[in-house]
C-alpha cells in the first residue's frame, strides 16, 4: 500500500550541537581524531626519514623544530590527553567489578589506568633516553 502523504520531518539546523554543553563537549572529544591523524602521518614520515638515512632524519628533526609544528604537536598532545581522560572515565562503566557483593566505584579503576599510563610513560622515556 502506498500513500501520497508526505511524512513530517522536523527541521534541524546545522548548529544543533551548540545548544547543550554535553553535545559541545561530545563534538570536541570526537574532534580529537583530527590531531590523532596528524600525529599518525607525522610518525609515518619520521619512520621513512629514519629508514632513508642520517640526512633524511636530520631534515625530519629540523621539521619538528619548526615553531608552528611544535604548537601543532602541543595541541595534539592536549587532544590525546583529553581523549585518554574521557576513555578512562568510560572504562568503569563498561566493567562491572563486584567486590564483597558490592559494585566497585569508578575511582579505583580510573586511578589504576592513570597509574599504568604514568608508569608506561616513564619506562618508555627511560629506555628512549638512557638505554
Swiss-Prot record:
Stated name of the protein: Fumarate reductase subunit C
NCBIfam families documented for this protein: PRK04987.1
One cellular component term from this protein's GO annotations in UniProt: fumarate reductase complex
Protein family membership: Belongs to the FrdC family.
Source species: Escherichia coli O81 (strain ED1a)
Gene (name only): frdC
Quaternary structure annotation from Swiss-Prot or TrEMBL: Part of an enzyme complex containing four subunits: a flavoprotein (FrdA), an iron-sulfur protein (FrdB), and two hydrophobic anchor proteins (FrdC and FrdD).
GO molecular function, one term: succinate dehydrogenase activity
Function of the molecule: Two distinct, membrane-bound, FAD-containing enzymes are responsible for the catalysis of fumarate and succinate interconversion; fumarate reductase is used in anaerobic growth, and succinate dehydrogenase is used in aerobic growth. Anchors the catalytic components of the fumarate reductase complex to the cell inner membrane, binds quinones.
Gene3D superfamilies listed in its UniProt record: Fumarate reductase/succinate dehydrogenase, transmembrane subunit
Residue spans crossing the bilayer: 30-50, 63-83, 109-129
SUPFAM superfamilies from the UniProt entry: Fumarate reductase respiratory complex transmembrane subunits (SSF81343)
Membrane topology, as annotated: Multi-pass membrane protein
Annotated keywords: Cell inner membrane, Cell membrane, Membrane, Transmembrane, Transmembrane helix
Amino acid at each position: 500500500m502506498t500513500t501520497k502523504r508526505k511524512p513530517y520531518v522536523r527541521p534541524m539546523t546545522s548548529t544543533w550541537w551548540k545548544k547543550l554543553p554535553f553535545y559541545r563537549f561530545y563534538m570536541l572529544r570526537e574532534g580529537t581524531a583530527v590531531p590523532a591523524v596528524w600525529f599518525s602521518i607525522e610518525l609515518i614520515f619520521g619512520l621513512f626519514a629514519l629508514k632513508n638515512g642520517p640526512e633524511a632524519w636530520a631534515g625530519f628533526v629540523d621539521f619538528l623544530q619548526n615553531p608552528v609544528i611544535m604548537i601543532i604537536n602541543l595541541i595534539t598532545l592536549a587532544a590525546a590527553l583529553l581523549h585518554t581522560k574521557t576513555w578512562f572515565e568510560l572504562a568503569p562503566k563498561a566493567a562491572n567489578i563486584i567486590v564483597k557483593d558490592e559494585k566497585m566505584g569508578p575511582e579505583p579503576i580510573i586511578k589504576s589506568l592513570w597509574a599504568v599510563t604514568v608508569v608506561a610513560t616513564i619506562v618508555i622515556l627511560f629506555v628512549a633516553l638512557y638505554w
